[in-house]
Amino acid sequence: MSYLILSIVILLIGILGIILNRSNLIIMLMCVELVLLASTILLLFESRVLYTLFGQIFAIVILTVAAAESAIGLAIMVNYYRLRGTIAVRASNLLRG
């Protein structure tokens, strides 16, 4: 039961971090990683309770996707910093329609 509480707490911290922090892209990326970690812990808890391997398999897939997502996100942020000189969210007005 403690895994469920831990997962919910980490999920809430990640969501609140995304909502409350609108100034730094790196902190927002870290909060997205917290949400993915919480979902992984929840799947592992489900796998342990139901005695199945599906939760563990999905957890490995989620961790793989999270690693790729963070690598791509950091590469985009490095290029954005080289272009703009800042990683502040407020300075991002590159998308014009």
UniProtKB/Swiss-Prot annotation:
| Disulfide links within the chain | none
Keywords, alphabetical: Electron transport, Membrane, Mitochondrion, NAD, Respiratory chain, Translocase, Transmembrane, Transmembrane helix, Transport, Ubiquinone
What name is this protein filed under?
Answer: NADH-ubiquinone oxidoreductase chain 4L
What's a single GO MF annotation on this record?
Answer: NADH dehydrogenase (ubiquinone) activity
User: Where does it reside?
Assistant: Mitochondrion membrane
Reactions catalysed: a ubiquinone + NADH + 5 H(+)(in) = a ubiquinol + NAD(+) + 4 H(+)(out)
TM helices/strands, residue ranges: 1-21, 25-45, 57-77
Bilayer topology reads: Multi-pass membrane protein
Q: Which PANTHER family match?
A: NADH-UBIQUINONE OXIDOREDUCTASE CHAIN 4L, NADH-UBIQUINONE OXIDOREDUCTASE SUBUNIT ND4L
Entry-linked HAMAP family = NDH1_NuoK
Biological processes, Gene Ontology terms? ATP synthesis coupled electron transport
Q: What is its EC number?
A: 7.1.1.2
Q: Which gene encodes it?
A: ND4L
Family, per the entry? Answer: Belongs to the complex I subunit 4L family.
Name a single GO cellular component.
mitochondrial membrane
